[in-house]
Every structure is written in structure tokens, then in C-alpha cells.
Amino acid sequence: MILIDSHPQHDWLVGAVEKRLREELAKRTVEINEEKSKIVDLAKGGSFTFLGFEYRRILGRNQQWRPYYAPKLKKRTALLAKLKEIFRQNISQPVEGVIEQINPILRGWVNYFAVGASSECFSFVRDWVEKKVRGHLMRARERSGLGWKRWRTKWLYEKLGLYHDYRLRRLWSLRKVQPAPTVP
């Protein structure tokens, strides 16, 4: 993935970058797959997917255009299908065992997609998982509903140990390491 500014004065860069890329790859006896390679103009509303993320350009709060990348809907759907299968296979098992199985999957998926604009997707996944756990608990007690009055959300995460670290990791928010002071 190579990103180039869309300003008209940089139009010559597209050809130059492609030429240089072909030269460098030829040194390593690697060729560009023309079927998989494409040039996308994000300034004209284009978007592309790469490594499970969808990339496009949006207008930010400060009225400046900025890149936007979030998990693909297909990846979220695949995660939910996998979790649904675990709930289905363990329908008569205690909820603690189900949570032990889904927590590593959730942790890995969230850690991978914890960059970019993933909070809306994380919120959906968290709500979906919470409803499935509540439904599992109610089914074990042969009751209908989701037990909103019976169990507080805090109880699900603290007592049962349901995965709850759906925070985004922003690279720019990490503290910069200060160099060690030099002694004269």
C-alpha cells in the first residue's frame, strides 16, 4: 500500500512511484500482480480494503479531510458467526465455560482491530456478546428475556470474567520516551 497526496502538483508521482517500485521488485525477482493491484483516488470517494480494514477519506470535525479506516463488515460478521457457533455448541454448558472459550477470541480480534475508527464496531460486538451471555444465563434458568433486572452489566464483567477491554489504542496518545539525561 503506497499513499500519495492527491494534490494536482503531485500527479507525476504516481508514474514515478510505480516505475521505482517495479525496479526495486525486479531486483528481488518479484512481480506486481496486476489483477490484485489498483490505484484508488480517495479524493473522488474511492475506498479500498487491506488486511481486514476498509480505508476511505472523510471530513473531520475541524473541516479537514482525513483518512478513515475501520474493520470491514465482513470481518465483524465472521467474528459473530464464530462466537454464535460456540454459543450453539455449548447451549447446555455452564456460562463460565462458554466465557473461557470466547474470551481469547474476543481479545485477539479486539487487539488486532484496536487502531483506527473501530469504536462503533466494538460497541456493536460488545452489546451482541453481552446479550448472548444473558440469553445463555436465562435459558439455563428456563426463563424468557435477557435478565436485565436480574444481573447488572458490571456483574457480567467482574464476576463472570467476560472480556471487557474494548479500548482503542491510538499511537499518537502514547507517551514519548524521553532520552536519558547526559552527565557532563
Residue ranges of each PLM-predicted region?
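Non-catalytic terminal/accessory segments
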Residues: 1-184
